[in-house]
Every structure is written in C-alpha cells, then in structure tokens.
Amino acid sequence: NQAQYATVLPHLAARPPKMLDWLPWNHVFAGNSNFNMILANGGSLYLDGGKPVKGLFDTSLANLREHAGNLAFNVPLYFAMLVREMERDADLRRAFFADLDILFYAGASLDAATWAALERMGREERGEPPMMISSWGMTETAPSALIVH
C-alpha cells in the first residue's frame, strides 16, 4: 500500500509527513496505513489521547493546537465535530489549516455540509482547500484498494 500511496500522493515524498492520530492501533487504518506511511516517508507521528467522543474530544482539540500536521487522516465524525469547533474558534481553524496538504477520511461517508465547510475554511485560511480524498479499503487485507480525490 505504501507504493500505491507514493504513486497517487506525491505530496508524501515532497516533505516528511506529520500526523496527529488517535485511531486504534489494532485497526488497519491506523496500524497499517497511517503508521507505515509515517515510517515509509520519514515523518513524525503524534499520538492523540483523545478521540471524537464526548469527554475526550477536548483532548484532541488541545493536541491539535500543539501538533497540527500536514496530513489529517480521520473518520467523518471527527471532521464533523472539528468543523463545529472551528466555526467558533478562529485560532484552532488557523492551526489546523496552516500546514495541511491532505485531508483524508474513511470508514463512512463525509456529509456534504462538513465537506463544504472544510473547503470553505481551507480557502479562507490558505487561499485554497487542501487536497480532500477518501479511499476504499479492505480491513482484512490492506488499508487501500482505491483512492479518489
């Protein structure tokens, strides 16, 4: 999969990836895709003790303020919750988009309102939205079988 990512996402070779990740390590999304992407490209992975659930999302927001990356790989619920916070917090919005190259979601559909809000905020903060992509994968075999953007 890392060869596929390198072919489809040349951004990864352009500069070392930096990612904040809460996803469970026993799952192919975090354990195979994200972790191996960081290793293959000499990047930095920051482990997030929060996640998109009540009582833990504030931890994710604090970590994001400190370690926003050039990659944001997550599930749609995370991005929906993040959009609500960024609508109220311009500093958080600036931190999230400041260095962001790629926004990736998987695990479910990203609703149109969240997609539109992320594009709009990206334009407001950097003049254009980051590359927004998704992937169809197979948990049993590999994290990605098809990538679309």
For the regions a language model picked out, list residue spans one by one.
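Gly/Ser/Thr-rich phosphate-binding loop
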Residues: 41-44, 61-62, 69-74, 83-149
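Generic hydrophobic-segment detector
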Residues: 20, 28, 32, 97-98, ...
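Conserved AMP-binding/adenylation subdomain of ANL enzymes
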Residues: 1-18, 25-90
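Short, low-complexity intrinsically disordered segments
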Residues: 20-23, 134
